[in-house]
């Protein structure tokens, strides 16, 4: 049996049409019981790595999801966290769900979340 170099094989493949190459790949997969789509699994794993990097982010948005029963305490907490005036803080609380802080450091976001939850609000970090 004649042995072909990679260059010779590439030259032969270069002369084939896409239909001929597709048929060749199918025949190759059947003969050697393999799948040409295997590298796709490696590509699918890449987003998982991206998700892990996303979990390690250092900036968070503090979202006021719901006010709860203690609206006045929540307004006071929003004023303390954001240094907003009374009217602005009330408008923010009345417009929930809204961002109280955006792109805050993790420790600041956790502190704000804790203060708002103590006041009776429902808060999430994004």
From Swiss-Prot:
Membership in a protein family: Belongs to the bacterial ribosomal protein bL12 family.
Subunit and interaction comment: Homodimer. Part of the ribosomal stalk of the 50S ribosomal subunit. Forms a multimeric L10(L12)X complex, where L10 forms an elongated spine to which 2 to 4 L12 dimers bind in a sequential fashion. Binds GTP-bound translation factors.
GO molecular function: mRNA binding; structural constituent of ribosome
GO CC terms: cytosolic large ribosomal subunit
The protein, known as: Large ribosomal subunit protein bL12
Region described as Disordered: 107-126
Keywords: Ribonucleoprotein, Ribosomal protein
GO aspect biological process, one term: translation
Function of the molecule: Forms part of the ribosomal stalk which helps the ribosome interact with GTP-bound translation factors. Is thus essential for accurate translation.
Ranges of biased composition (kind: Basic and acidic residues): 107-116
């Amino acid at each position: 049996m004649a042995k072909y170099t990679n260059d010779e094989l590439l030259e032969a493949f270069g002369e084939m049409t896409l239909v001929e190459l597709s048929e060749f790949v199918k025949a190759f997969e059947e003969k050697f019981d393999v799948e040409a789509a295997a590298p796709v699994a490696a590509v699918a794993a890449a987003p998982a790595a991206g998700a892990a990097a996303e979990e390690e982010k250092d900036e968070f948005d503090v979202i006021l999801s719901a006010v709860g029963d203690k609206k006045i305490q929540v307004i006071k907490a929003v004023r303390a966290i954001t240094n907003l005036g009374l009217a602005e803080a009330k408008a923010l609380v009345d417009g929930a769900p809204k961002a109280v802080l955006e792109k805050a450091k993790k420790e600041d976001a956790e502190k704000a979340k804790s203060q708002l939850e103590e006041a009776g609000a429902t808060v999430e970090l994004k």
